[in-house]
């Protein structure tokens, strides 16, 4: 296994900045504001798929955002467990066909489009439909924590879970979250803000340890807006402390201590988008039941060799083998 120095560092690294003193009070207050179940529309769609019911869910999120999610439920007389899937930065939720694999094991799947990215959810900024990236990380950081884009996304997730948990066909005690990159971060956020989430799989999670990202000089597509903010708006870094203090409220490593369910994290050691060190800033702050897998030859890319089977097993309790069967 290559890079032993990095492997040694990531096992104890907890990030560059500490959690703000009022962090939990802030998020408890924000969650309380949206604790009443919002009005929503759940419309069934007939796609001629036997044994499965498909729905489109829409509701109004914070700051006039419109949130859209696909919902797939196996036809069952029993209440069904749910897997919440979250997509990568600038992307959109799973296609309907992608969601069907889990229904074979009796699980429902909910896949939310993040507002303002490539799906059907609408950004509350004048209710624009479609892509408003880039700039989602940094949006609102100058104005303060109440204006952060991801604050609203995190609250969308909390409300989504509450809506789905309230459905009569759903087993509210068996909810899981899953995603990669931005989706991995949001899967962790789901567990941190809503204790209904019992299991989480996070593959190379994004949105962590912003100070370290800045120090590394990460100009990859996902983080370049942070780099560009300072290059073109504050080249002398006169606002760095203020910006970092504000972004701390959406830094996923700072939410880690709130997670009570089980967590599995998967990391590619060659990841130059969401650096492994920033991912383990999250992992090492988790106080729950946790485990990680490292893939030394992988970067920030599709992990299709055995990984999908492992994720499926862990979420569904199946026993697909992790090696070639002769």
Can you describe what each PLM-predicted range is?
Residues 1-52, 324-326:
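N-terminal targeting or regulatory segments adjacent to alpha/beta-hydrolase or S9 domains
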Residues 189-237, 294:
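Hydrolase active-site cap/lid region
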Residues 94, 100-103, 107-155:
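Cap/lid segment of the alpha/beta-hydrolase catalytic domain
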Residues 294-312:
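Histidine-bearing beta->alpha loop at or near hydrolase active sites
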Residues 258-259, 265-267, 271:
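Short beta-strand/loop motif that positions the catalytic acidic residue
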Residues 269-274, 301:
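Acidic catalytic loop of the alpha/beta-hydrolase fold
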Residues 33-77:
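N-terminal cap/lid segment of alpha/beta-hydrolase-fold proteins
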Residues 136-181:
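Gly/Ser-rich "nucleophile elbow"/oxyanion-hole loop immediately N-terminal to the catalytic nucleophile
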């Amino acid at each position: 296994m290559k890079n032993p120095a990095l492997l040694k560092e990531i096992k104890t690294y907890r990030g560059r900045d500490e959690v703000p003193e009022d962090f939990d009070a802030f998020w408890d207050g924000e969650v309380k504001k949206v604790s009443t179940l919002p009005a929503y529309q759940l419309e069934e769609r007939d796609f001629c798929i036997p044994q499965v019911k498909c729905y489109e869910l829409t509701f109004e999120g914070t700051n006039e955002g419109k949130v859209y999610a696909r919902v797939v439920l196996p036809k069952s007389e029993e209440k069904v467990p749910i897997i919440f899937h979250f997509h990568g930065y600038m992307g959109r939720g799973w296609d309907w066909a992608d969601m069907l694999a889990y229904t074979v094991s009796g699980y429902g799947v909910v896949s939310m489009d993040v507002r303002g990215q490539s799906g059907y959810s609408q950004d509350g900024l004048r209710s624009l439909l479609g892509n408003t990236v880039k700039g989602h990380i940094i949006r609102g950081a100058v104005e303060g924590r109440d204006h952060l884009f991801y604050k609203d996304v995190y609250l969308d997730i909390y409300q989504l879970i509450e809506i789905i948990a309230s459905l009569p066909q759903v087993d509210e005690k068996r909810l899981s979250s899953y995603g990669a990159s931005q989706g991995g971060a949001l899967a962790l956020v789901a567990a941190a803000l809503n204790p209904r989430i019992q299991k989480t799989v996070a593959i190379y999670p994004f949105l962590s340890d912003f100070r370290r990202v800045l120090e590394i000089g990460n100009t990859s597509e996902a983080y370049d807006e942070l780099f560009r903010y300072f290059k073109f708006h504050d080249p002398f870094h006169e606002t760095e402390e203020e910006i970092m203090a504000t972004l701390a409220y959406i830094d996923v490593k700072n939410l880690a201590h709130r997670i009570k369910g089980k967590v599995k994290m998967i990391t590619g050691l060659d990841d130059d988008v969401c650096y492994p060190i920033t991912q383990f800033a999250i992992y090492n702050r988790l106080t729950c039941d946790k485990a990680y897998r490292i893939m030394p030859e992988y970067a920030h890319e599709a992990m299709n060799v055995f990984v999908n089977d492992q994720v499926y097993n862990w979420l569904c309790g199946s026993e697909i083998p992790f090696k070639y069967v002769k």
